[in-house]
Design a protein with these regions (language model features):
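Flexible, D/E/H-enriched segments
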Residues: 1-19, 27-30, 48-142
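Catalytic-core regions built around general acid/base machinery
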Residues: 24
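Beta-strand elements within well-structured catalytic alpha/beta cores of enzymes
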Residues: 32-40
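A structural signal for small-residue-enriched, beta-sheet-centric alpha/beta enzyme cores
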Residues: 40-48
Length: 142
């Protein structure tokens, strides 16, 4: 997804793309194990007068939203990312593709957020679906 050349896609558009990916995967004739990655920088701005900007609170709230309220994240306007978290933070909308592909209910099993000496916040979140847990329980019982 291109977020470099404006206009950037909205979070809602990316979230809905993820839902379409979920539908495509579920329509497959075979039982598949699928891993979906969402990538992109967290809060950061590497140029201009605000170079070096990192907004840890914005990042943590975004990670919270991925687990608990992705619909609210999908409604964040692109200009909010730019204003509150730096012009490169628009990359976060790409994480919403992953989240849309996971469906409504997820379990957060891992989270990491770090602001290194560089000017880009780093984050990672691992979410698992209820379907994954059901498959895992079925394999363990067999």
């Amino acid at each position: 997804v291109n977020v470099i050349q404006y206009p950037a896609p909205t979070g809602n558009r990316c979230y809905n793309l993820g839902k379409a990916i979920k539908t495509a995967v579920e329509s497959w004739d075979e039982d598949l194990n699928v891993v979906i990655f969402g990538t992109g920088g967290m809060s950061h701005q590497i140029q201009g007068p605000r170079a070096g900007l990192v907004n840890k609170e914005f990042d943590i709230a975004f990670l919270d939203g991925l687990s608990k309220d992705p619909e609210a994240l999908a409604k964040i306007p692109p200009m909010t990312y730019l204003r509150d978290a730096g012009n490169e933070a628009i990359e976060l909308v790409m994480w919403l593709i992953m989240r849309g592909a996971l469906g409504d209910k997820v379990d957060e099993v891992y989270r990491f957020h770090h602001v290194p000496a560089s000017s880009t916040a780093v984050g990672c979140i691992i979410l698992e679906t209820g379907e994954y847990h059901a498959q895992k329980a079925g394999r363990a019982a067999a």
